[in-house]
Amino acid sequence: MEITFLGTSSGVPTRSRNVSSIALRLPQRAEIWLFDCGEGTQHQLLRSDLKSSQIRRIFITHMHGDHIFGLMGLLASIGLAGSAQDIDIYGPPGLGDYLRACAKYSYTNLANRVRVHAISPGILYEDEEFTVSCQLLKHRIPAHGYRIAEKDRPGRFDVEKANALGIPPGPIYGKLKKGETVTLPDGSKIRGQSLCGETEIGRKIAYCTDTIFCEGSIELAQNADVLIHEATFAHQDAGLAFESVHSTSTMAAQVALAAQVKLLLMTHFSPRYLPGNSLDISNLLEEARAIFPNTKLAYDFLTYEVPRNRQEMALGVK
């Protein structure tokens, strides 16, 4: 699970930050899941090592332009490139109407099938590896945060030990690898767990934007390995945060602390904190770390690989 920030600015792009979009790369299945798609996202993809042809799912938090204005252009470009892969899009009611209107009035025919799913709180996608759920956040319009939970996996299967027990290779190995109990031809029973190493704990990521401090964020982020949370304003600008229903850096840190996450990655910064102003984002980082020390600032093209088994986390840029 590899997170790449494609846009980290709030509202409008700046010279160094595009508007909201995050890519979650799943190398084991050659897929990319996109979270929000602000204007210019496809340009950011071209500047990265990510392949738009691998995008299989897109999750939209809410219908503000800085989170959706890049979506139709990206879908059109993927279609023009000849990709025949289906794309599933999840977002608020109205997202499907918006995309249909864009396609109609721009005379755009998508080569691939695009399915739009209107979301509501709860589990919205599940397969053998992952569960994705959402919760309502607190913003000026309906907005949802997302939680991506990888399922626990059995530890490494000990083939040598299985051979020593006289277990013949074949389909039975598959059952044992899953931790199941099997009966051998001689009637003896073997517990799969006894042949596997320690269970690999599934990794968890929460994405919360746009929102002010709320219980929905805490619920989504509970015990997450990584919480990606908006930090539009500094603490001293809390009045602006309440007025616009956005978070301060201290609110993001309070969510991380309450949810007992491992790492907080702050994003969605107001352009008012560009270098040269009385406050810049280093001040936001200082404020957040006073509450939740393991806090980092996201920036465009930051890549972070979520480690397995909740090992010590380290940032890496590609």
Swiss-Prot record:
InterPro entries listed in its UniProt record: Metallo-B-lactamas, RibonucZ/Hydroxyglut_hydro, RNase_Z/BN
Keyword list, A-Z: Endonuclease, Hydrolase, Metal-binding, Nuclease, tRNA processing, Zinc
Catalytic activity: Endonucleolytic cleavage of RNA, removing extra 3' nucleotides from tRNA precursor, generating 3' termini of tRNAs. A 3'-hydroxy group is left at the tRNA terminus and a 5'-phosphoryl group is left at the trailer molecule
Active site: 66
GO molecular function term, any single one: 3'-tRNA processing endoribonuclease activity
Enzyme class per UniProt: hydrolase
Note accompanying the cofactor annotation: Binds 2 Zn(2+) ions.
Hydrolase in keyword set: yes
Residues involved in Zn(2+) 2 binding: 66-67, 210, 268
Bilayer-crossing regions: none
Enzyme Commission code(s) on record: 3.1.26.11
Annotated Gene3D superfamilies: Ribonuclease Z/Hydroxyacylglutathione hydrolase-like
Cofactor: Zn(2+)
Binding site for Zn(2+) 1: 62, 64, 139, 210
Family: Belongs to the RNase Z family.
UniProt-listed NCBIfam families: PRK00055.1-3 (NF000801), RNase_Z (TIGR02651)
Subunit structure: Homodimer.
Cross-referenced HAMAP family: RNase_Z_BN
Function: Zinc phosphodiesterase, which displays some tRNA 3'-processing endonuclease activity. Probably involved in tRNA maturation, by removing a 3'-trailer from precursor tRNA.
Protein name from the UniProt record: Ribonuclease Z
Organism of this sequence: Microcystis aeruginosa (strain NIES-843 / IAM M-2473)
Gene that this polypeptide is encoded by: rnz
